[in-house]
Design a protein with these regions (language model features):
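SAM-dependent Rossmann-like transferase core, predominantly class I methyltransferases
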Residues: 1-17, 166-233
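Conserved SAM/SAH cofactor-binding pocket of Class I
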Residues: 2-78, 217-306
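Class I S-adenosylmethionine-dependent transferase superfamily signal
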Residues: 36, 123-124, 248, 324, ...
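Intrinsically disordered, low-complexity terminal tails and inter-domain linkers enriched
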Residues: 64, 72-99, 324
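Conserved proline-anchored active-site loop of SAM-dependent methyltransferases
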Residues: 101-113, 237-245, 301-313
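A short glycine-rich, Lys/Arg-flanked "PGG" loop and its adjoining helix->strand segment in the class I
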Residues: 117-129, 320-330
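Conserved beta-strand signature within the Rossmann-like core of class I S-adenosyl-L-methionine
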Residues: 130-138, 331-338
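Class I S-adenosyl-L-methionine
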Residues: 152-196, 340-371
Length: 371
């Protein structure tokens, strides 16, 4: 499989000299990471992704090159290949003998700007002194990414694509060499408050998490439509920043909630939000590529709720419905919020009984009951 344009640009513009340690992200299935590991047999490569499904696909396609390539799905970049399971947002390498030799980030012009800013800062932090950062963008007219690089490095190289196939130029690659740690470390996570039936709750959000810095209108509609009873066990499918989980847990006595998400930052934010609201004993969360909760919890939930994204042509919505079916006990209720209820009414009718839809705040909440 050919890499997306921005990732292919980095592949074509890697340094000539061997790289000992490399940190990279991927927009597909780790093609850049796999090529680095293959080109330099003595290299150690970490491929970082914020999507558990992409992580699974990368491992399946690229393998591990005898342990030299590790694919990780954690909230932040690791400090080094030896610390690839313990990333932290503020970790800084300040010497020539630690950290990565190369960081390479493929990005898209339509990506989330705040996430790109944070990943650039983290990548700079993870480089050793003298290490090199490369970032590509699939927009030949880009200036925004160039400006961000000039905030980090005194000198930035620019390579504008000359498509070898003779087609339309694919984008730009920027490069910078770390000569000192950053003087200022900006934080991009945030806390925001919202009310549910008179209860003030606080949530935590980070770039890359759905609806960063605010409660999504669809999520608000779902919160208004759900009615967990005391003692219920609730599954929050695609928990994001955890606002639905927190509202459900605060609704009544003994309500427990488990959130699942494919983004490790979403899991982190949900757990941090639970701690902020003294709900850590009632709200848990786990990372998953298929929306399923842990095996020991399946078949135990009274209510499953979800706000699936629209960008996947209902693939993720289908995963949510399958997960709800596996997670609910007989008679348990599933709620899905959407602006386009027809697909849900048809698909949920194949799995659940008593399927119906109600309009809440210009959204539709589709309800079903497990047979």
């Amino acid at each position: 499989m050919r890499a997306p344009d921005s990732e292919q640009l980095l592949i074509e513009n890697l340094p000539d000299e061997p790289v000992g340690t490399a940190l990279c992200t991927t927009r597909a299935r780790g093609q850049l990471a796999g090529l680095i590991a293959a080109r330099w047999p003595d290299s150690r490569v970490v491929c970082h992704t914020l999507d558990a499904y992409h992580a699974q696909e990368t491992v399946a396609v690229q393998g591990s090159y005898g342990g030299r390539l590790e694919t990780v799905c954690i909230p932040d970049f690791p400090l080094s290949p030896a610390d690839s399971r313990n990333g932290e947002s503020t970790g800084v390498v300040d010497s020539a003998g630690e950290g990565f030799d190369l960081a390479a980030l493929p990005t898209t012009a339509g990506g989330e700007s705040e996430l790109t800013r944070e990943l650039l800062r983290e990548a700079h932090n993870r480089l050793r002194i003298g290490g090199r950062l490369l970032i590509s963008v699939d927009n030949v007219s880009d200036s925004w990414t160039h400006d961000r690089m000039r905030e980090l490095f005194p000198k930035v190289t620019v390579v504008t694509d000359e498509n070898p196939t003779g087609g339309k130029p694919r984008g730009v690659v920027y490069g910078g060499t770390k000569d000192a740690p950053l003087r200022k470390q900006k934080e991009y996570d945030c806390e925001f408050a919202f009310r549910d039936r008179g209860t003030l709750l606080k949530a935590v959000s980070r770039p890359g998490v759905f609806s960063h810095r605010r409660i999504d209108p669809g999520g608000r509609s779902l919160i208004e439509a759900m009615a967990p009873a005391d003692g219920d066990r609730v599954l929050d499918l695609g928990c994001g920043s955890g606002v639905v989980s927190l509202a459900a847990a605060a609704r009544g006595e003994g309500i427990t909630v488990h959130g699942v998400d494919s983004n490790p930052r979403a899991v982190e934010c949900t757990l941090r939000g639970a701690a902020l609201n003294d709900l850590s004993d009632r709200v848990t969360a786990s990372l998953t590529a298929d929306a399923l909760p842990p095996a020991e919890l399946r078949g135990t939930f009274d209510l499953a709720v979800g706000n699936p994204p629209y960008f996947s042509h209902q693939r993720i919505a289908g995963l949510f419905l399958a997960a709800a079916d596996a997670a609910l006990k007989p008679g348990g209720v599933v709620l899905m919020v959407t602006k386009q209820p027809s697909w849900f009414l048809e698909s949920m009718g194949e799995r659940f009984a008593d399927v119906s839809s109600e309009e809440v705040r210009r959204y539709h909440v589709v309800r079903g009951r497990k047979r």
